[in-house]
């Protein structure tokens, strides 16, 4: 039986010194040592032009049903400066969960590191 939506407001944040040690390690190597359990779909491509080649920060994870961005709206206000928002939407590539207005809010107001 499904338990419905859950939003965890308390986050266990990683130690900044430990995070910074990952700055020069390729993501593929990190994925390998985590049992190949933390990689993105290879169809996902970079669409921005980041200032730095590699970035490190805590992840705020969002699990949403395809086409349902309610959980993502909650994440907009939970995200902290420097966070990366990672969204799983049941691999639905037919509908977008966010657009330009939400992206601008995250970038300029919340100052997240990436999505």
Regions flagged by a language model, labelled:
Residues 93, 105-115:
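Ligand/cofactor pocket segment of small-molecule handling proteins
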Residues 1-63:
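Intrinsically disordered, low-complexity regions enriched in acidic/Ser/Thr/Pro/Gln residues
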Residues 22, 84, 105-108:
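Phenylalanine-focused residue identity feature
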Residues 42-45, 63-64, 86-88, 114-115:
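General beta-strand structural signal in soluble alpha/beta enzymes
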Residues 32, 104-105:
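Surface-exposed charge patches
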Residues 50-103:
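A glycine-rich, hydrophobic loop/mini-helix early in the fold
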């Amino acid at each position: 039986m499904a338990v419905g939506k859950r939003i965890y407001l308390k986050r266990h944040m990683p130690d900044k010194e430990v995070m910074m040690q990952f700055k020069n390690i390729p993501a593929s190597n990190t994925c390998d040592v985590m049992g190949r359990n933390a990689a993105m779909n290879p169809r996902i491509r970079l669409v921005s032009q980041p200032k730095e080649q590699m970035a490190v920060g805590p992840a705020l994870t969002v699990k949403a049903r395809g086409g349902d961005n309610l959980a993502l709206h909650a994440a907009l206000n939970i995200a902290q400066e420097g966070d990366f928002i990672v969204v799983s939407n049941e691999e639905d590539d037919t509908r977008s969960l966010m657009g330009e207005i939400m992206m601008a809010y995250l970038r300029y107001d919340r100052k997240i590191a990436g999505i």
